[in-house]
Protein backbone atom coordinates (compact mmCIF):
# COMPACT_ATOMS: atom_id res chain seq x y z
CA UNK A 1 0.00 0.00 0.00
CA UNK A 2 1.43 3.33 -1.03
CA UNK A 3 0.78 6.50 0.97
CA UNK A 4 -0.57 9.42 -0.92
CA UNK A 5 1.62 12.53 -0.70
CA UNK A 6 -0.13 15.74 0.10
CA UNK A 7 1.30 19.17 -0.69
CA UNK A 8 2.01 19.60 3.04
CA UNK A 9 3.90 16.30 3.34
CA UNK A 10 5.94 17.16 0.24
CA UNK A 11 6.94 20.50 1.81
CA UNK A 12 7.97 18.78 5.04
CA UNK A 13 9.98 16.18 3.10
CA UNK A 14 11.61 18.88 0.96
CA UNK A 15 12.47 21.01 4.03
CA UNK A 16 14.02 18.00 5.79
CA UNK A 17 16.07 17.14 2.71
CA UNK A 18 17.29 20.75 2.40
CA UNK A 19 18.31 20.78 6.07
CA UNK A 20 20.23 17.52 5.67
CA UNK A 21 22.08 18.88 2.63
CA UNK A 22 22.86 22.18 4.38
CA UNK A 23 24.30 20.46 7.47
CA UNK A 24 26.36 18.05 5.35
CA UNK A 25 27.69 20.93 3.23
CA UNK A 26 29.59 22.48 6.18
CA UNK A 27 33.06 21.01 6.71
CA UNK A 28 33.43 19.13 9.99
CA UNK A 29 36.04 21.62 11.23
CA UNK A 30 33.63 24.53 10.95
CA UNK A 31 31.23 22.70 13.25
CA UNK A 32 33.93 21.80 15.77
CA UNK A 33 35.59 23.47 18.68
CA UNK A 34 37.39 26.81 18.49
CA UNK A 35 41.18 26.43 18.08
CA UNK A 36 41.82 28.72 21.09
CA UNK A 37 39.66 28.36 24.18
CA UNK A 38 38.66 31.33 26.35
CA UNK A 39 40.00 31.48 29.90
CA UNK A 40 39.23 33.55 32.98
CA UNK A 41 41.18 33.95 36.18
CA UNK A 42 40.17 36.01 39.20
CA UNK A 43 42.24 36.82 42.24
CA UNK A 44 41.62 38.91 45.33
CA UNK A 45 44.67 40.77 46.62
CA UNK A 46 43.88 42.39 49.98
CA UNK A 47 40.61 44.25 49.26
CA UNK A 48 41.12 44.47 45.49
CA UNK A 49 39.49 42.09 43.01
CA UNK A 50 41.46 41.35 39.83
CA UNK A 51 39.81 39.62 36.88
CA UNK A 52 41.48 38.55 33.63
CA UNK A 53 39.67 37.25 30.53
CA UNK A 54 41.77 35.98 27.65
CA UNK A 55 42.07 33.57 24.74
CA UNK A 56 44.44 30.62 25.13
CA UNK A 57 46.43 29.94 21.96
CA UNK A 58 48.13 26.56 21.71
CA UNK A 59 51.80 26.17 20.72
CA UNK A 60 51.16 23.02 18.62
CA UNK A 61 54.89 22.36 18.27
CA UNK A 62 55.65 25.80 16.82
CA UNK A 63 58.63 27.91 17.81
CA UNK A 64 57.05 30.83 19.64
CA UNK A 65 59.16 33.89 20.46
CA UNK A 66 61.41 35.15 17.69
CA UNK A 67 59.43 33.12 15.13
CA UNK A 68 55.61 32.99 15.45
CA UNK A 69 55.82 36.08 17.69
CA UNK A 70 58.47 38.43 16.22
CA UNK A 71 60.96 40.29 18.38
CA UNK A 72 60.57 44.05 18.90
CA UNK A 73 56.95 44.27 17.69
CA UNK A 74 53.77 44.89 19.66
CA UNK A 75 52.17 41.52 20.32
CA UNK A 76 48.88 40.70 21.91
CA UNK A 77 49.40 37.92 24.50
CA UNK A 78 46.32 35.90 23.67
CA UNK A 79 44.06 34.82 20.82
CA UNK A 80 40.93 36.45 19.40
CA UNK A 81 39.65 39.28 21.63
CA UNK A 82 42.35 41.24 23.45
CA UNK A 83 43.26 40.13 26.97
CA UNK A 84 41.15 42.18 29.39
CA UNK A 85 42.18 42.83 32.98
CA UNK A 86 39.92 44.56 35.49
CA UNK A 87 40.85 46.09 38.85
CA UNK A 88 38.06 47.27 41.16
CA UNK A 89 40.48 49.54 43.10
CA UNK A 90 43.62 51.46 42.22
CA UNK A 91 46.79 49.33 42.12
CA UNK A 92 50.51 49.62 41.45
CA UNK A 93 51.94 47.60 38.56
CA UNK A 94 55.71 47.26 38.85
CA UNK A 95 55.57 50.25 41.22
CA UNK A 96 53.62 52.48 38.79
CA UNK A 97 50.09 53.66 39.71
CA UNK A 98 47.09 52.42 37.73
CA UNK A 99 43.55 53.56 38.43
CA UNK A 100 40.70 51.12 38.92
CA UNK A 101 39.13 50.10 35.62
CA UNK A 102 39.20 47.74 32.67
CA UNK A 103 42.25 47.54 30.39
CA UNK A 104 43.89 45.36 27.74
CA UNK A 105 47.44 44.00 27.90
CA UNK A 106 50.00 44.07 25.08
CA UNK A 107 53.67 43.06 25.01
CA UNK A 108 56.80 43.92 23.08
CA UNK A 109 59.02 40.82 23.32
CA UNK A 110 62.76 41.39 22.99
CA UNK A 111 65.51 38.87 22.46
CA UNK A 112 68.18 40.50 24.67
CA UNK A 113 66.45 43.13 26.78
CA UNK A 114 63.54 43.46 29.18
CA UNK A 115 60.15 43.07 27.55
CA UNK A 116 57.67 45.94 27.54
CA UNK A 117 54.19 45.41 28.96
CA UNK A 118 51.67 47.92 27.62
CA UNK A 119 48.45 48.65 29.51
CA UNK A 120 45.82 50.13 27.20
CA UNK A 121 42.45 51.67 28.00
CA UNK A 122 41.09 50.26 24.69
CA UNK A 123 39.24 47.56 26.64
CA UNK A 124 36.96 45.90 24.07
CA UNK A 125 39.08 45.30 20.98
CA UNK A 126 40.21 42.41 18.83
CA UNK A 127 43.84 41.32 19.16
CA UNK A 128 44.82 42.84 15.80
CA UNK A 129 45.62 45.58 14.99
CA UNK A 130 47.18 47.22 18.06
CA UNK A 131 44.86 50.13 19.01
CA UNK A 132 47.77 52.56 19.25
CA UNK A 133 49.74 54.71 21.64
CA UNK A 134 46.89 57.19 22.14
CA UNK A 135 45.13 54.54 24.30
CA UNK A 136 48.21 53.64 26.36
CA UNK A 137 48.03 54.18 30.10
CA UNK A 138 51.28 52.52 31.20
CA UNK A 139 54.45 50.97 29.80
CA UNK A 140 56.38 48.64 32.09
CA UNK A 141 59.76 47.01 31.56
CA UNK A 142 59.71 43.41 32.80
CA UNK A 143 62.36 40.71 32.61
CA UNK A 144 60.96 37.42 31.26
CA UNK A 145 61.75 34.14 33.00
CA UNK A 146 62.67 30.77 31.51
CA UNK A 147 60.29 28.22 33.05
CA UNK A 148 58.87 24.75 32.51
CA UNK A 149 56.95 24.57 29.22
CA UNK A 150 53.19 24.91 28.84
CA UNK A 151 51.37 24.10 25.60
CA UNK A 152 48.44 26.53 26.05
CA UNK A 153 49.00 30.18 26.91
CA UNK A 154 48.13 30.77 30.58
CA UNK A 155 47.72 33.69 32.96
CA UNK A 156 47.86 32.90 36.66
CA UNK A 157 48.93 34.20 40.07
CA UNK A 158 51.76 32.01 41.43
CA UNK A 159 52.36 34.28 44.42
CA UNK A 160 49.74 36.11 46.48
CA UNK A 161 50.71 37.77 49.76
CA UNK A 162 48.87 40.15 52.05
CA UNK A 163 48.58 43.13 49.69
CA UNK A 164 50.70 42.11 46.71
CA UNK A 165 50.83 39.44 44.05
CA UNK A 166 52.59 38.35 40.89
CA UNK A 167 50.52 37.83 37.76
CA UNK A 168 52.34 35.61 35.29
CA UNK A 169 51.76 35.45 31.51
CA UNK A 170 53.18 32.07 30.44
CA UNK A 171 53.54 30.40 27.04
CA UNK A 172 56.01 27.78 25.97
CA UNK A 173 59.10 28.12 28.17
CA UNK A 174 58.73 31.87 28.72
CA UNK A 175 56.85 33.63 31.51
CA UNK A 176 56.41 37.36 32.01
CA UNK A 177 55.86 38.24 35.69
CA UNK A 178 54.02 41.45 36.58
CA UNK A 179 54.23 42.58 40.21
CA UNK A 180 50.96 44.00 41.55
CA UNK A 181 50.55 45.95 44.78
CA UNK A 182 47.01 46.53 46.07
CA UNK A 183 47.19 49.28 48.72
CA UNK A 184 43.43 49.95 49.04
CA UNK A 185 42.03 49.61 52.57
CA UNK A 186 38.38 50.27 53.39
CA UNK A 187 37.63 53.02 55.89
CA UNK A 188 37.01 51.70 59.42
CA UNK A 189 33.39 51.97 60.55
Where are these regions (language model features)?
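Bacterial N-terminal signal peptides
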Residues: 14-24
Amino acid sequence: MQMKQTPKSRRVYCAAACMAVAVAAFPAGSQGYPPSQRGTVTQNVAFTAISVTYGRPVARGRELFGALVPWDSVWHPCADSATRVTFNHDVLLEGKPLRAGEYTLWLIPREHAPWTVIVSRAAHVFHKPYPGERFEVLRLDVTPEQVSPVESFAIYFPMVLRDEAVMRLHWGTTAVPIRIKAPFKPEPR
